[in-house]
A protein has these predicted regions:
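N-terminal cationic and glycine-rich segments that engage phosphates or anionic surfaces
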Residues: 1-15, 19-49, 53-56
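Preference for short coil/turn "hinge" residues that link or interrupt alpha-helices
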Residues: 10, 31, 63-64, 108-110, ...
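Conserved NTP-handling cores and scaffolds of large molecular machines
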Residues: 14, 18-21, 65-69, 129
Length: 152
């Protein structure tokens, strides 16, 4: 599943790869090819490698976008944590507060506090309400979080 925002971001990346990156790399390959012997042309090899990466990413994104299940999380009017929820929790060991959003695998980005629906923390949070405790096993051991706030 993807949120509307996540789907839009993937579509934008795909548009950029097709409309900007692909033409740029084609031009770079043509430029490198004009420098002569391709067998010892590092510029040409690097451009071909980048082209391969870009084409692979385009294929991957086209597949994801074509079969994406987009969920409008603004329609969630519930006090229960579900896909798309923004959850404020407090670590019961450290009293540190953190806010996470539960998203699909392609949107997950821990630096933006977006956690995958399939992650251990998200699995522990799903179905809980404000005041509940979510427990899961982290690499550093068992973690417990109290749920302070849920929003969509």
């Amino acid at each position: 599943p993807l949120t509307k925002e996540g789907f839009a971001a993937l579509e934008q990346e795909l548009k950029n790869l097709k409309g900007v990156e692909r033409p740029n790399i084609i031009a770079a390959i043509a430029e490198a090819r004009s420098h002569g012997d391709l067998s010892e042309n590092a510029e040409y090899s690097a451009a071909k490698e980048k082209q391969s990466f870009i084409e692979g990413r385009i294929q991957e994104l086209e597949a994801v976008v074509s079969r994406a299940q987009v969920i409008d999380t603004s329609l969630n009017k519930t006090d229960v944590i579900r896909f798309g929820a923004k959850v404020l929790v407090v670590d019961e060991d450290t009293d540190k507060e953190s806010k996470y959003q539960i998203v699909g695998d392609y949107e997950a980005d821990i630096e933006k506090n977006k956690i995958s629906l399939s992650s251990p923390l998200a699995k522990a949070l799903i179905g809980k309400e404000v005041g509940d405790t979510a427990e899961y096993i982290a690499p550093g051991g068992k973690k417990s979080f109290e749920i302070l706030e849920i929003s969509y």
